[in-house]
């Protein structure tokens, strides 16, 4: 359950982090996550898109949890995340938003609300170990300049044309991405520690994405989907046709169409999803070792 990271935006089923982890665990997936989902602690409205590839706030992650119809006691693992869509991607990618405002929203949603949903997960699934998957740096100071500008334009739907110094604008954009990544990581860790103290047991584990600044979009060792700079309107991923069909059903406008078709850009590619799966497998193995030693 969660947003596009747990869903595996742009990836074929067999390449998704959740799929790789499930194969390792020898279990089946009940996929609740979808692109664009927010935690939505205070939301009651809901709607369903024709494809999980189409970014949409709803069903929220809380609604995903509430809509689970299986036997809660049979669930052994829950892979989850959330928060960036409550903060809003446009805010993270807006250098004109003050750092303190970005930090406030990040603390509220990746801290307070992530803790709230994690507490509900551990209460609903009494036998499950929750794996809280961290975010990654979407951009870094190792990202190519044209790549930074391209991703900004995609997120906001406008040409990169700052009125002030372009270099300063790019730098602040990157700093926003790095700040969100680092702060959300710390908040996720704190939420996991809080739940484990509260329950008196190892009910949750924080799983770092395993990605560093060199793995950001347009960086030398990028593990994220990227548009080619000479063909910025061509989607690079495995699920673009699914989104194309879904877009026609939704009937959105031309601007929304382009954003939907390119919505995998900035998400973990095949290698990136595999890296996160490795991190999850390692975390599960460590948890099993600790349990056996008790």
Per-range role (PLM):
Residues 7-105:
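Conserved SGNH/GDSL esterase-like catalytic core that processes O-acyl groups on lipids
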Residues 266, 272-273, 290, 294:
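Cysteine endopeptidase catalytic domains of the caspase/legumain-like
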Residues 275, 279-291:
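C-terminal alpha-helix
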Residues 59-267, 274:
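Alpha-helical cap/lid subdomain in secreted, periplasmic
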Residues 4:
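Catalytic nucleophile serine of serine hydrolases
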């Amino acid at each position: 359950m969660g947003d596009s990271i747990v869903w595996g935006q742009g990836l074929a089923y067999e390449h998704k982090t959740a799929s790789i982890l499930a194969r390792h665990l020898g279990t089946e997936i009940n996929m609740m996550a979808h692109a664009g989902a927010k935690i939505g602690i205070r939301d009651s409205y809901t709607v369903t898109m024709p494809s999980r590839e189409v970014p949409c706030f709803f069903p929220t992650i809380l609604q995903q949890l509430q809509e689970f119809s299986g036997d809660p006691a049979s669930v052994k693992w829950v892979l989850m995340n959330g928060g960036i869509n409550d903060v809003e991607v446009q805010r993270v990618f807006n250098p004109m938003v003050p750092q303190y405002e970005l930090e406030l929203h990040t603390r509220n949603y990746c801290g307070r609300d992530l803790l709230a949903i994690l507490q509900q997960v551990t209460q609903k699934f009494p036998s499950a170990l929750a794996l809280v998957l961290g975010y990654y740096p979407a951009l870094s100071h190792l990202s190519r300049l044209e790549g930074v500008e391209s991703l900004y334009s995609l997120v906001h739907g406008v040409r990169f044309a700052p009125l002030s110094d372009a270099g300063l604008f790019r730098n602040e954009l990157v700093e926003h991405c790095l700040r969100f990544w680092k702060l959300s990581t710390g908040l996720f860790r704190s939420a996991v520690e809080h739940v484990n103290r509260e329950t008196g047991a190892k009910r949750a584990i924080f799983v770092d994405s395993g990605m560093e600044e060199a793995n950001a979009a347009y960086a030398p060792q990028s593990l994220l989907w990227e548009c080619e700079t000479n063909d910025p309107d061509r989607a690079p991923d495995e699920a673009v046709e699914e989104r194309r069909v879904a877009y026609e059903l939704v009937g959105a406008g031309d601007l929304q169409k382009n954003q939907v078709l390119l919505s995998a850009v900035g998400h973990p590619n095949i290698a990136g999803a595999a890296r996160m799966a490795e991190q999850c497998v390692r975390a599960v193995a460590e948890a099993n070792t600790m349990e056996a030693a008790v």
